[in-house]
Amino acid sequence: VNNLDDNATYEVRVTATNHLGTSEMSKSYIASTTSVTPPSMQEYKLINRPTSENEIGTTHIVDVRNKKDENGWASQDDYLHYDSKYALVDGDFTTEWKVDNWDTGASYGADRGSEITFDDTYTIGSIGIGRTLQSGHYMGLYKVKVTYWDENDNKNVVYTESINEKWSNGNSYYMVKLNEPIRAKKIKVDTSGYGGSTQIISELKFYEYDTLSDDIKNLYEDDLRLVLKKSVTQDVLNELAKRLDTPDPISGEYHPDKDVLKKELDTAQKLFDDKEVSEKITTLDASIRTNNEGPSLGMGNSYQSLGSVARPSVDDKGTSKQIVVYMGSSDPNTRVDIVFLQNYGLPGSYMSKVQTVSPGRTEITIPSIISADVEKGGQVMARVTQGSTTANVQIRLSGVTEIPNLNVNNMINDTTKEKEVKDKIRNYISELKTYMNDINTLYPSEVSDKDKINNVYLYDEQTSPLNTTDIEGDRFTLTLPASEILKGIESGLEGNTEAQVNRVYDALLAWEQEVKVGFAKKGVFEEVQDFNGNGEIDDEDRAYFRKHRAPLTRLNIKYQRMMMGAAAYASNHHIGVGFSSSQYIQGVPYKFDENGKVTNADSAHLYGGLIGHEMGHVMDIGDRLYPETSNNLMTAITGTMLNENSPYFDSFKKVYEKVTSNTIGLSTDRTVVLNMLWQPYLAYEDNITYEMLFTDVDADLTNDSYFAKLNRAYREMSEEERVNGDRDQWLIRLSSKVVGKNLTDFYEAHGIIANETTLAYVSKFPKETKKIQYINDEARRQRIAGTADMEEVTTLSASFANGITTGSYVDSKEVKINLSVDKSNDRILGYEIYRNGEPCGFIERDKVNSQTVYTDTVENINNRVVEYKAVAYDYNLNPTNEVQLG
C-alpha cells in the first residue's frame, strides 16, 4: 500500500478474490506507519539534482530506458520490478527499482541495469547508490559494473569494487568510486551483492569528477605518500589549499573528504617544510597467514598491530567517524583485512567485522563493538590474506591515536640482531614512559551523560582504550594495558634503563620459548628438513612437513573482561587475561651453552601455570580431549623444564589410591586423570624436559619426546587405528604404538578397559611388565641420573605392627604393616600391598624413618580371613621379593 502518511494509524481489512467470487471482509487490524527519513547523500559536484521542473524529477537527465519498457530490450524478466520508468533517478527515495536476486548484471549476463541519458557529456568520477528505505532487506554490495557511451556513442565497460557504505539518518547508502574517471553521455549501472542479498535501489546519483583528491595524491612519488615530487612548490600547495576551501557553487557543500584531504595536504606541507617529518608507517609480515598447511593448534590469530587505537563517535551531522587506510604493496594482488578490537572486551564481543582493503586508500567507519557503559574503541589490526608471502606491504592510518608498539618480529630470535632489538626496546620504553605521563591529557577533566552517548569518557586505567600497548614477536603478540607493562618493566629496576631493556629482552625471548615448548609438545616443525634421512629434501619430506607444519599465526595474550570470577580463558583468537598483567613482561628464558646445557637454572622461568593451562586449551587435541585436564599437560611440561616435580606431584597419593582400587572408570579427580596422561612420559622419556626444544624440532625423529610422537600419531591416525574407537581406546592404541609396548595393564589400573579391537591392535607390541602406574617425577629423575636401580638381591621385610601376629584375630578396622628393605633403601620408590590377592594400596617410602608403615582400613569383612602380601619397587620399578602376611 503506497502513499500512506508517516506516523499515522490505519484500520486494515482485507478480502480475497478468485474464480468463485470475493470473500467477506476480514476482521479489522490496526497498523501504524513510521517516519522514514532518507539519507542525506553528498551533493558536491552532483549532476542529477532533484527538481520539480521536469517529468523525470532530477536535472541533466533527458531519458531513461528500462529493460522491460516498451522500447526496452526484453519483455520478460521475472526478477526485475520498478515503480516507474524514472524510479532510479526521480529524486524520490520512496520509489524503487528492484531485482529479486543478488546480481543485476555485474557478474552474469542478466543485463538489467537501466540506460540513463544525460543532456550533455559529463566526466564522472563517482556514483551514489541509495538503498531501499524498507527494513529487512540486505543489499551487500561488493561489485559495480558501469556501461557507458561517450559523445561519439562508443560503448565502454568498467568494473569497480571501490565501494564505501555510509550511514545517515539511520539508513545506509553506497558511494562507488570509479577506478578512473569516465566521459559519459549515456550510462548504465549494474550491481552484485553477496549471497542472499537483493538489489533494491531507491536512487542513483552521478557526480562529476573532481581532480582535487588526485592532485593531492600526485604530490607524492610513492603510493604511501612519504616522498614529495621535486616539482612540488609552495604555490602548488597554496593553490590546492585554496581549492579545498572553496565550496561547490551550486550546493554550497565542500569536498566530502575535506577533513581527510586537509590532513593529507597538511602532511604534504610538513614534508615540504621538513623533509624528515613523516607519519607512522607499519610494515606487515606477509607470511603470517591463517591458511596453514599443517595443524592450526587452535592459534587462529594472524592479525598484526598497526600501533593505533580507533574510537567511534558521531559528528553533529550524524555521520560516524571513519579512519582512512593507506595500503601499498609490491604485489598489486595483496589483500589485507582490517579489524577493530575492543579494549577490555567481552569474551564474545571483542572484534569487529572484517573490512578487506586493496592497495590504495580506503575509508572505514569505526564500529561500536559493545554497548556497555565504558569507552568504546581499541586497536586497529591488520592481516595479509592474499598475494605474495614475500611482498613488501605497508600501511598508514589516519583518524586514529597512536599507541606505544614494540615489533621485533623476524628479529627477536636472531642473535646477530640483539643490539638492534635492544635499541628498539630502549626506544619503546622511552616512548611508553612519555605516553603514560601524558595519557591524562588525552582525556577531558569532566564529562556529561550526553558526552558518554558520543563516547566521551573520563580516563579510567582499567577501561580506557588508550591505556594499551602491543608487543609483537615471531610467535606471540601481547595486547595488554600500557600501565601494567610499564609497571612490569620498572618494578625493582627504577632508574636503571639498561636493566629494564634486558628485562624486556628476556621477557620476549621467554614468550618465544613458551610457544616453542608448545610446538615441541605438539610435534610440529617450522621448516622442512631431511626427515627420511636420505641426504636430500624430497617430496616425502615435504609431505611430512605439510602434515606437521607449525602454524604461521601467533599466540595473542589480550586484556579482556573476565566473567564469573575467571582468571583467564582461551579462544581461537586469543588468551584472555585480567588487568593485573605486569608479570607478562618479566619472564626469563632458559639459556643454553654450546653443549645445550642450561646456564641460568636459578633465574629461568616462563609464564606459569595459568598461561600453560590456557595454552593447553588452545592446543588440545579433539580426539584426546579430557576437559579441564589434558590441557594441563602444558602446565606440567613448562613447570618441569629442569625435571622438577610437576605442579600436580602432590596428587600422586590419590593416583595410588585409584590404581589400587580395582575399579572400572576414570577417576573423578582431574589431577589423577592428568597424572595418568603424564605417567607414560615419566616412564619412557629419558631426556631432561627442556631438551625437547632441540630434539623435537630437528630432522632426527627417533629421539623426539613422548608427547611429540604421540601428537603426530594422532594426526596420522589411520582408519584401522580409528575403527571402533573413542577417546579412551585411541589413547591406549596410540600411546602403546608410540612407546612400542602394550599398555593395557597400565590403563586398566586407571579404570580404562581395552575393547577387543584395541586388544587386537596392541597385541603386536610386547606387554609392559613394569607397573608404570606407580611412577612419579622423582622416579624419573633417579632413572635419568642413573640412581634408580637397587642392588641385586635387595630383600623386603614386612610385618604386622601393634603386636598383630599371623593367624590372630584382629578387633580393629585398621591393620598396620611395617615395611623395609635390607639395603638400597634410598633407591626404593615405594611398597605395593595386596589384600586377598588384589592390590589394595601403594605407599611411597618413608624418607625420614628406616621403616615405612602402611595402614589398611578394613571395612565390612568381620569374621573373615584376610591375607596380605607386600612388594617393594625401586625407582626403576624393579620389584623385590614378595612377603606374605596373614
PLM segments and residue spans:
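Beta-rich interaction/scaffold domains
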Residues: T15-N18, M41, T211-K275
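Disordered, acidic Ser/Thr/Pro-rich linker "stalks" and the adjacent N-terminal cap
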Residues: V36-D120, T132-M139, L240-K242
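Beta/coil-rich, acidic/histidine-enriched accessory regions frequently appended to metallopeptidases
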Residues: D274-L297, V324, R727-Q851, I861-N878, ...
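Catalytic cores of extracellular degradative/oxidative enzymes
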Residues: S448-Y459, T463, N467-E691, T695-D698, ...
